[in-house]
Amino acid sequence: MNMKTNTATQLLLAACAGVLSCPGAWGSTTVCQDQSYYLKTACPHPLSLAGPTADRVYLRFQTGWASKYECEGLDLWDGSLCMFVPEIQYKEWVGKIWYGVSTDHRNHAELKYRLDYIKELGNWTVMPWYEHSFVFPGDKGIPRPGLKTTYHFSDRWFGGTDLYWQYNNHTFRGYYAVFAGLHEEIADCVRVDAVVRYGYNGGYVGPVVHHGSNALDYNLSFTFRATSRLTVELFTNYSQALTVVKQRDLGDDFYYGINLKYTF
């Protein structure tokens, strides 16, 4: 087992977040894309989530596969990932249960309970969230609060921040990211999203990786509305190692995957 695999295994119990996915990644891609932008589209079945003002309960189920379980610029499981996510939304509130399992290592799995509050304030989307994560085997659970803000420059361009912390060993340790991107309807019922994301480790990823610049992620995804209830997403991501990750001979990972989401 090489140094990269050993180090990533140590990091697994210390931090995880993508898948889209990282703690901020419970949107459509593993790069922590905002869940609540609303694309103006000619498609008869809109590609966005239901507007938070809709006075009804939405039930969804998402399943997906990724060639790597990548979080904060690190390949945590040294193998591919399958995930299963039941989800419920009422107005601004979204609750999820995320379960991910390694397809290459039987003893690698993770369970997350998560609650998001999504609020539109003019051109801003503000999303405070809370997540409790359990890594199997042997983890007693890690609480993770976060705050994601997105500014929509237009129907196409957006940018924002993604800040989150985990409470471990009686201390809050943070990870701080900024991102920018665009989404575009390239055909009826087909949307492309491109996002660039910079991440800074403030103790969240440790103890092996020190404080400093972690990774620069480049993500590209295509979302297809197959039916009025089913969307299919294909994504690819390159995570470029920056200072503190590169010093450990980690990162510089390319991965890809598919997500299916069904709305009941």
Task: List each model region and its residues.
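Repeated loop/turn-to-beta-strand initiation elements of outer-membrane beta-barrel proteins
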Residues: 59, 92-97, 122-128, 155-161, ...
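Structural signature of outer-membrane beta-barrel channels/translocons
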Residues: 52, 87-91, 116-122, 150-156, ...
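Residues that define the transmembrane beta-barrel architecture of outer-membrane proteins
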Residues: 55-57, 77-82, 107-111, 124, ...
